Amino acid sequence: TIKTAEPDMVNPDEWYNNKLKGAGGQDDSHLPDGSKSLSQLMAQSSLGKDSGYSRLGADLLFEYNKAVMKNSARLSMLQLAGLMMKNPDTIFIVEGHTDSFGSEEYNAVLSLMRANAVRQWLKDNGIALTRPNGECRLYIRACGSSRPVVSIRGDRDAQAANRRVEIHMRKPGEE
């Protein structure tokens, strides 16, 4: 059972507006090359490094400059939980990314805290963090501002796509 501190109702207008603000206002039809929505990944029969990855806008999951998950993150997290439950042998790598504002050290810590918040939510909601053979299946990585996807010359709104959490998948034995 998925635990939640919030009522089961999500305001659809708030969720949709937050989704649009997520990765630079992009919906599923404008995902970057190689990126797939969690819904698209759920439709695949198996996952591995050739499956692509999912990019979740940090503005959808977290308040600006924070690592506490927003209520509107619930749908994305439930989709990720479902994906993990459907693929118990798949290894998941959760990467936290930030924009270029703040020091490198601060951004590294913030991105780690965000990736760990995703990990902790999954753990708190009963998602197995180990594969059936007992090996780890969820890793977190802090990327800070080291891997921007849009120019770092812009203001806070222009860099929204750089604030993200990426979910990468691997089959056991894949590098």
What kind of region is each of these model predictions?
Residues T98-E175:
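Periplasmic OmpA-like peptidoglycan-binding domain that tethers envelope proteins to the cell wall
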Residues T1-I91, R156, K171-E175:
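Periplasmic peptidoglycan-binding/tethering modules of Gram-negative envelope proteins
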Residues F92-H97:
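Glycine- and acidic-rich phosphate- and metal-coordinating loops
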